[in-house]
């Protein structure tokens, strides 16, 4: 995703720029970081990487505009500035700094989206898996892709989306990030989570049983991390499709379950 490249650039930039700022007042430090974020698309241009991932024409313009919109949003930039200050105060570990700058916004904000947008978001996430090789897809869903490789794989998959889909996907991402600044993740109660998990697993079971490779898929779901990449990818797609097919009063709860960090 383009934003992670920008944030990596930001992290490297503030290694030099933040310490002097922190010697001043906290508010001055925060204001300077927000200003730096606004200039980040110029300091750490990502156009070449986007082109290498397959973005071109309207889709390239959309990706660049999305990154700029996020970095120049005072609400989001203020949140990231606070995280950077926490990093230098020792309240945020450097090991998780670049991921931790913005990931919490997604994790929280997505859970506050209206059902229609939440459905759209997860449908696009499902389609992105089709834009990857079975190996990359399997490693991704098993959480075994190196960060740099994961960024590239997801970027290339996003570049395969239509411009119309990409535009709406970015709009929803931006909205989720703004929601995530001020709201904690919406969570199901333990009882609701247990009930909806049963509903989801039953839906997944029915889909798996109807597949030609039902036994392999069943074994994969029981021991996901050690499964073959291609089968893990297929199982992840089935799981996502089963959740997206749930309707009625359970729909939102199933989507919240799917959105849990």
Over which residues does each language-model region extend?
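Sec/Tat signal peptide C-region and signal peptidase I cleavage site
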Residues: 19-23
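Bacterial N-terminal signal peptides
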Residues: 9-17
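N-terminal Sec/ER secretory leader and immediately downstream segment
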Residues: 24-142
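Long, contiguous all-alpha helical interaction modules
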Residues: 50, 79, 143-157, 245-247, ...
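Secretory pathway export signals and precursors
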Residues: 12, 132-133, 229
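A cross-kingdom marker for long, charged
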Residues: 201-261
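Extended amphipathic alpha-helical interaction segments
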Residues: 120-221
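Bacterial N-terminal signal peptides that target proteins for export
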Residues: 1-7
């Amino acid at each position: 995703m383009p934003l992670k490249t920008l944030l990596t650039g930001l992290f490297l930039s503030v290694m030099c720029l933040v310490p002097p700022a922190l010697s001043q007042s906290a508010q001055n430090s925060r204001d300077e970081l927000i200003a730096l974020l606004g200039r980040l698309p110029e300091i750490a241009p990502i156009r070449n990487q986007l082109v290498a991932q397959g973005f071109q024409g309207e889709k390239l313009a959309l990706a660049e505009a999305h990154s700029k919109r996020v970095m120049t949003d005072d609400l989001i930039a203020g949140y990231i500035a606070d995280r950077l200050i926490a990093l230098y105060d020792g309240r945020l570990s450097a090991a998780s700094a670049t991921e931790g700058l913005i990931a919490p916004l997604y994790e929280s904000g997505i859970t506050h989206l209206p059902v229609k947008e939440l459905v759209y978001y997860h449908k696009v996430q499902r389609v992105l898996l089709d834009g990857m090789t079975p190996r990359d897809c399997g490693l991704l869903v098993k959480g075994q892709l190196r960060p740099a490789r994961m960024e590239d794989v997801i970027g290339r998959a996003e570049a395969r989306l239509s411009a119309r889909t990409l535009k709406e996907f970015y709009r929803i991402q931006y909205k989720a990030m703004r929601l995530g600044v001020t709201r904690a993740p919406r969570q199901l109660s333990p009882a609701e989570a247990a009930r909806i998990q049963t509903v989801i697993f039953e839906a997944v079971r029915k889909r798996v049983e109807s597949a030609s490779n039902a036994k392999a898929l069943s074994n994969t779901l029981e021991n996901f991390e050690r499964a073959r990449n291609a089968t893990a990818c297929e199982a992840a797609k089935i799981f996502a499709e089963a959740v997206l097919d749930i309707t009625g009063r359970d729909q939102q709860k199933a989507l919240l379950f799917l959105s849990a960090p």
